[in-house]
Amino acid sequence: MAAAAAEEGMEPRALQYEQTLMYGRYTQDLGAFAKEEAARIRLGGPEPWKGPPSSRAAPELLEYGRSRCARCRVCSVRCHKFLVSRVGEDWIFLVLLGLLMALVSWVMDYAIAACLQAQQWMSRGLNTSILLQYLAWVTYPVVLITFSAGFTQILAPQAVGSGIPEMKTILRGVVLKEYLTLKTFIAKVIGLTCALGSGMPLGKEGPFVHIASMCAALLSKFLSLFGGIYENESRNTEMLAAACAVGVGCCFAAPIGGVLFSIEVTSTFFAVRNYWRGFFAATFSAFIFRVLAVWNRDEETITALFKTRFRLDFPFDLQELPAFAVIGIASGFGGALFVYLNRKIVQVMRKQKTINRFLMRKRLLFPALVTLLISTLTFPPGFGQFMAGQLSQKETLVTLFDNRTWVRQGLVEELEPPSTSQAWNPPRANVFLTLVIFILMKFWMSALATTIPVPCGAFMPVFVIGAAFGRLVGESMAAWFPDGIHTDSSTYRIVPGGYAVVGAAALAGAVTHTVSTAVIVFELTGQIAHILPVMIAVILANAVAQSLQPSLYDSIIRIKKLPYLPELGWGRHQQYRVRVEDIMVRDVPHVALSCTFRDLRLALHRTKGRMLALVESPESMILLGSIERSQVVALLGAQLSPARRRQHMQERRATQTSPLSDQEGPPTPEASVCFQVNTEDSAFPAARGETHKPLKPALKRGPSVTRNLGESPTGSAESAGIALRSLFCGSPPPEAASEKLESCEKRKLKRVRISLASDADLEGEMSPEEILEWEEQQLDEPVNFSDCKIDPAPFQLVERTSLHKTHTIFSLLGVDHAYVTSIGRLIGIVTLKELRKAIEGSVTAQGVKVRPPLASFRDSATSSSDTETTEVHALWGPHSRHGLPREGSPSDSDDKCQ
């Protein structure tokens, strides 16, 4: 029974997150479940089953008296008040956040470097045997990746992937269950360390944004124990925005680029009041991160992470700008291709049902096979010698940013034997062939590796590929102009490292659709000499990539089916002529103020949305407010609850025994008690409120209809009602209902609960036909909404609102639906689904009135149709002294709404 109850208790959680082979996937009713849970808790519904009761000490033993703990708590509270009064709560939070993230980043880098050194040590120690060296080279990353995938899957599947797409969704207002918890933080940190320590082409920046956000959420919960602003949940969003900047800042020691990058990838509209928070926390975190490197004697002083030494007097010539522009345009196409390839890999694996089902049963097989393939191809004595397979990502960037020219004669003799630059010039190949093979192989390897179900990002692999492409162009320019470019009797040699910097920023910007990668590159290299070529290449790459594909993070949002709102895009002027009346759904699920419970049940059958519109009457359709689905379910469940049926039975029994009695309530039954064997599961307490309790715990109920009925005394699960179950399973005929009830009774023979019951309970059994008749009578009664929490001012739009203004409002306010009204009359509803289809140009004709091509040929001088005008006149009233308001043009209505 405990195992069954545990399985039922875990069932609602599966509605939030669905683990797939590569990426996880969230369902469409993501925020609805969280709000239903909040409504259940607020209304005092039954708690989910959490296992057998544990033997805890008495509550009085947990109270603190005059002990040392009490004195420590008083002292900590006084210190907190002193610091808050002198420094301020925001500064304390941001300092702690920056310090913790710097420590986490430095410890992770130290562990990753140790893992990579261990792999190199094993490979060099077994160089006498190629077979043993290959086995060591392949087994090491396979073990680490398998452990990372298994550990993440067991502890917190939400830790899989980058984290930036989910943070973008969370900052928009969507609630993702268990995404910012402690166990997800542990799974993300350990899983990311093992994944990066394996040497796979994976990144750190995206997961670190998620780690910083989790750290900020946990820190807010901890500091809320002391009171203050941390108890305000609306403040958490501002702290999460600052945490995203800290994640990038302490990852690359790039505070300015980190703040700008976090704003670009997570926000559509950014609150300027959070600007200083991000800069302060990111700067402090980057400072501590580099100080720890100096303390560990990794660096002599605080320097850039990949310091370059380009010449400053003449870094590039004006004639080289076309080459930089070519890098930007090519990077734009390459970034779009990378996003397309990454999404196509996931879609192909999902469409192959047989392979997908097999790999879903063997979850660790897919990451192991991918790691085995990539490790085999990068084996240094094998094919890896033609793509610098022995170099890590950090060593690869250091060599690619080198300002020396590799194709110059005599370079190999000048390089020292242990130099890592020799990896790009193997004995049986040249620099150009090695760079081409490296770019092609790393391109599809990175797109494939980022689909492994482990914590990983794609920024750093793309950054390295872009640097290699820029280096290829730079080496080609150096080969074409071996003596450099002559300018005013002066000769300046080509610097291939500058081309690598430009290529890295351009390709990373094309994949992420950001311009701040240019600033990140400047902070990474410590030089700003190539600012003009970098900006030109990044802008051109973004222009090309944004016209072809969405960003990598938006692509993952679509793969995971997270709620999102696409951008309007460029050059689509017809979108500015589309109005809300062209895209709204006219068949709005609603309930009237004078409706019956049968109407409530029909409304719940018609829609799966989390909100229902409340109107005055079906004729007038005057919008009075909105009511949550959980509230409607609670009303219907209370009307058909076992408590009401028990009361009905007692009243009928009282009428039969004493028909001449004038008492309104039923008489108290006799107190004779006997044992009752109950074979049904129930989520409610016994009918009698005495100290007698069942000897075995009741099983948790499955349907969500009875969640909010915990305060009413109820009976068995059979008394939940056939009509109530038909809300989710359809309305069966009486014969089928009785057969189903009998089969359920046979299946529940093993679920025995011994309890104490009165003789009145034993005599009050109703047949299924009587239950159906009683429920039909209850469904015909009118609904009383006085006990419901109704939103009296739901968000509304008028039918003449433009698509551009609607998109801006949805983005700014973070709403997911809006009712469309005309002089208070409900005429439609617009949700994220309709808005997304209108923007993407794929509006269907199901319930949506669209005039192709999206009302672009609408006559702006024409008003509404005759039917609508007649209805508005009738609603306005024939005896009104004022005339009907004139309907202006779209531009006029937009100006008035501003």
UniProtKB/Swiss-Prot annotation:
<dbReference type="Pfam" id="PF00654">
    <property type="entry name" value="Voltage_CLC"/>
</dbReference>
<feature type="region of interest" description="Disordered">
    <location>
        <begin position="856"/>
        <end position="898"/>
    </location>
</feature>
<keyword id="KW-0406">Ion transport</keyword>
<keyword id="KW-0966">Cell projection</keyword>
<dbReference type="GO" id="GO:0032347">
    <property type="term" value="P:regulation of aldosterone biosynthetic process"/>
</dbReference>
<dbReference type="GO" id="GO:0030324">
    <property type="term" value="P:lung development"/>
</dbReference>
<feature type="topological domain" description="Cytoplasmic">
    <location>
        <begin position="2"/>
        <end position="87"/>
    </location>
</feature>
<feature type="intramembrane region" description="Helical">
    <location>
        <begin position="497"/>
        <end position="511"/>
    </location>
</feature>
<dbReference type="GO" id="GO:0060041">
    <property type="term" value="P:retina development in camera-type eye"/>
</dbReference>
<dbReference type="GO" id="GO:0045211">
    <property type="term" value="C:postsynaptic membrane"/>
</dbReference>
<feature type="binding site">
    <location>
        <position position="459"/>
    </location>
    <ligand>
        <name>chloride</name>
    </ligand>
</feature>
<keyword id="KW-0407">Ion channel</keyword>
<feature type="domain" description="CBS 1">
    <location>
        <begin position="584"/>
        <end position="642"/>
    </location>
</feature>
<dbReference type="InterPro" id="IPR050970">
    <property type="entry name" value="Cl_channel_volt-gated"/>
</dbReference>
<keyword id="KW-0813">Transport</keyword>
<keyword id="KW-0851">Voltage-gated channel</keyword>
<dbReference type="GO" id="GO:0072320">
    <property type="term" value="F:volume-sensitive chloride channel activity"/>
</dbReference>
<keyword id="KW-0677">Repeat</keyword>
<dbReference type="GO" id="GO:0090425">
    <property type="term" value="P:acinar cell differentiation"/>
</dbReference>
<comment type="subunit">
    <text>Homodimer. Interacts with auxiliary subunit HEPACAM.</text>
</comment>
<feature type="short sequence motif" description="Selectivity filter part_1">
    <location>
        <begin position="161"/>
        <end position="165"/>
    </location>
</feature>
<feature type="region of interest" description="Disordered">
    <location>
        <begin position="686"/>
        <end position="717"/>
    </location>
</feature>
<dbReference type="GO" id="GO:0005886">
    <property type="term" value="C:plasma membrane"/>
</dbReference>
<feature type="intramembrane region" description="Helical">
    <location>
        <begin position="239"/>
        <end position="251"/>
    </location>
</feature>
<dbReference type="GO" id="GO:0017081">
    <property type="term" value="F:chloride channel regulator activity"/>
</dbReference>
<feature type="binding site">
    <location>
        <position position="162"/>
    </location>
    <ligand>
        <name>chloride</name>
    </ligand>
</feature>
<dbReference type="GO" id="GO:0048714">
    <property type="term" value="P:positive regulation of oligodendrocyte differentiation"/>
</dbReference>
<dbReference type="GO" id="GO:0097450">
    <property type="term" value="C:astrocyte end-foot"/>
</dbReference>
<feature type="region of interest" description="Disordered">
    <location>
        <begin position="643"/>
        <end position="672"/>
    </location>
</feature>
<dbReference type="GO" id="GO:0060689">
    <property type="term" value="P:cell differentiation involved in salivary gland development"/>
</dbReference>
<feature type="transmembrane region" description="Helical">
    <location>
        <begin position="130"/>
        <end position="155"/>
    </location>
</feature>
<feature type="modified residue" description="N-acetylalanine">
    <location>
        <position position="2"/>
    </location>
</feature>
<keyword id="KW-0887">Epilepsy</keyword>
<dbReference type="GO" id="GO:0071476">
    <property type="term" value="P:cellular hypotonic response"/>
</dbReference>
<feature type="intramembrane region" description="Helical">
    <location>
        <begin position="164"/>
        <end position="171"/>
    </location>
</feature>
<feature type="domain" description="CBS 2">
    <location>
        <begin position="790"/>
        <end position="850"/>
    </location>
</feature>
<feature type="intramembrane region" description="Note=Loop between two helices">
    <location>
        <begin position="512"/>
        <end position="513"/>
    </location>
</feature>
<keyword id="KW-0628">Postsynaptic cell membrane</keyword>
<feature type="site" description="Couples extracellular acidification to the channel closure">
    <location>
        <position position="530"/>
    </location>
</feature>
<keyword id="KW-0472">Membrane</keyword>
<keyword id="KW-1133">Transmembrane helix</keyword>
<dbReference type="GO" id="GO:0016323">
    <property type="term" value="C:basolateral plasma membrane"/>
</dbReference>
